[in-house]
Every structure is written in structure tokens, then in C-alpha cells.
Amino acid sequence: MYPYSESDAQRLHQEAPKASQLAHSEVDLRSDFSRDRARVLHSAALRRLADKTQVVGPRDGDTPRTRLTHSLEVAQIARGMGSGLGLDPELSELAGLCHDIGHPPYGHNGEKALNEVAAACGGFEGNAQTLRILTRLEPKVVSADGTSFGLNLTRAALDAACKYPWTKTSPDGTINRKYGAYDEDAHILEWVRRGHTDLRPSLEAQTMDFSDDIAYSVHDVEDGIVAGRIDLKVLWDLVELAALAQKGARAFGGDPEELIEGAATLRELPVVAAAADFDASLSSYAALKAMTSELVGRYVGSTIAATRAAARLGEYEFGRMHGELVIRPEADREVRLLKTLAVLYVMDDPGHLARQDRQRDRIFRVFDYLTLGAPGSLDPMYRQWFLEADDDAGRARVVVDQIASMTESRLERLARNASGISGFLG
């Protein structure tokens, strides 16, 4: 396994030893990274993902996939891939658990709406919110002067969870569309990235990122097939496939021909052909599960082999700060094609845009409701931060933090309250 250092295990705030052990208790022999994983697993922020949208809403269907179930799948894939690469399995799993922890209600649609209302305080980005939750907002470790350090994870754990290790504003003033830290959290990111010589994410973070793509494409396609929104026979319909590839290239970038090539290699797999005949029978459910299992193994196994081969050839040093995940072109094409299937068939649903409009309206209403009623409208923890804020931007950030933390059920209850008040006021 990669030799992690004392610096990797450092925490932002030094913690006192536990003082409530019973007499003659065994010493806690867990590693620092095992403790980190436990902190994330027991966090309220992770549990709230159970009521946040993945591709469809958490209340759609009998066996819905939510941000939480998706995160558990990403964590399992990342642990296996990380172990195969010689990375700490606890860190790899933790990265998967954390990867969506900063996402607000309604997924990417909610993220866009919050970015609009947060314009006065520098915008909103789910990945930057993840760092903020882990190091500030999740109540676990508070210093004597009342400063919150969030879960107070180790440096390596925070780095593993950081997909975009740069702030919104680059040193040259360039504004980044995707980023892993708000400008006001730059000092925390600087501490996390100590020892890195470039902007490349840690190898654990790269592993988490591709595990996310695998889970998103394979498992969400499975959901779509069961729900009747996706028919794998499109892989054999070259006319519809060409149209789908064009849409996928526009949505996710790349060449449509690459997606068509991805479909061609998928058609050659017997498990894909068997799953294409899904009819909700017992045998077809088993065939579908066989396909998801084999595809995950296909992409994880090929990536481990390609990455290890490149390292043996001496193309780079191998480890947390010195590694490049190598994804084989065939795997990349297939994953992007499946991701296109997972997303675009939902996006083409006639009710999708109307549903998104309603979601955005709720976020706008709740933001106005909380802002106008603050600090009394805020939860006690956020109320304290609101009162401590130095300016309007800081106070707006606190309101955005609270909305981002909400489950969809709670946001909808508040939106109804906000509608009632605005109706009463005329």
C-alpha cells in the first residue's frame, strides 16, 4: 500500500484524547483514515442525501436511487478500485461517500438555482459546498473559542474528497466554472493541498471521480430500464443511436462517433444483449443485475490494470500526490454512452422541464422567505453564524448554507409556508 505520511494524517484542529472510556477498555486501534470514514458515515449531512434527487426524485418508484444510495455505490466502487491501486481503502471509500455531500435539494437543477440567488456572496457550487460542510458546517469538532472545524478530517481525507482542487477565482483573476472551494475558504484548501506541486487532484480523488461516472452510468441506466424510460434496444437502432450520440456530444462534449463506437462494443457483450430483453420477469431482473455487475467489473478492472501498467513503465511516480488514473479509451466511450442514456431519456421527458421550473421557484421563494425573516427564520446554528457575519455577503452565504443543507421534503414545506405568507400579504 502507498506509504501515507504524518502530514497526511494531520487535522486542522488538534483533538484531545477521548475521556469517557470505561476502566480497562481497549485502546482504539483504528487508523486515522478509518476514524475519518466513520465520521462521514455517521454525519447528518450524509443521511440527508436520502431525500435529495439523483436523476429522478427520491419519492419516484418503489426502489428509488437517491443521492445517498448513489453515494454508497460510488463508495463501494471507489474502495475496490483504490484497493487495487494500493491506495488506502478507507480513504477511497470515504471519497465516494463525500463526493455528493455538498449537493443541494434537486441535484444540478437546485445547484443552478442556488448559484443564482448566491450571486451576491460569490455563487454556489456543490463541490465547494462539500469542503465547506466537511470543514465548517457539519457539527462535530468545535474549538474552545467556538470555531467550528466541521468533521475535522485528516488532510489526506479532505484531499481525497476534493475533485476540483482550486478556488472559484484563479490567481490571475480568471473565474472557474467548476471549483472545489469558495474564495473565502482558500486558506483551508491551501492547507489541504500542502505538498502538491500542481493542480492535479489526488489519486484518491481521481478514483472517486471515475467511480462516480461508473455508478452514474451503469446503475442509473438500470433504474431507467426498470422504470421503462430506457430501452437498451436503442443500441441496435442505428438511426436513433446516431441522434442520441449527437445529443450526448452536445451535452457532455466529445465526438458523436466516439459514442457510436461505445455502443458498438457494448452490443458485443452477451450480458448487454440479455438485459435488452427486459420484461420485468424474474429472469430478466437477474439478467439486468448480471449486466450491471459485469460492466462495473469491466471498467474497474481495466482501469486498475492500465494505471498500474503506466506506473510500471515509469511514466510517473505512483501514489496520493503522484499519480494519473489511466482510463482505457473503450471504457471511456462506453461509460459516456451509458451516461448519455441515463440522463437524456429523463431530460426528454415532457414533464421534466416543468418539474424543474417548479423546483427552482421553490428555492427562490425559500431564499426570500429566510432572508426577509432572518435571523429568526433560521435554525439556531445558522442564526448564530448569521449574527456573527461581517457584511451582507456573509449573511447571504449563511442563508445559502442552510438551504443547501435541507432535504427536499423540508424545502417543500418551507416553500408552502412562504407561499402562504406572500399570499396573506397580498
From Swiss-Prot:
Example of a GO biological process term: dGTP catabolic process
InterPro entries the record matches: dGTPase, dGTPase-like, dNTPase_2, HD/PDEase_dom, HD_domain, PHydrolase_assoc_dom
SUPFAM superfamilies named in the record: HD-domain/PDEase-like
HD domain location: 67-217
Region (Disordered): 1-23
Signal peptide (UniProt feature, chain positions): none
Domain of life: Bacteria
GO molecular function, one term: dGTPase activity
Keywords: Hydrolase
Similarity section: Belongs to the dGTPase family. Type 2 subfamily.
Protein name, per record: Deoxyguanosinetriphosphate triphosphohydrolase-like protein
Source organism of this protein record: Corynebacterium efficiens (strain DSM 44549 / YS-314 / AJ 12310 / JCM 11189 / NBRC 100395)
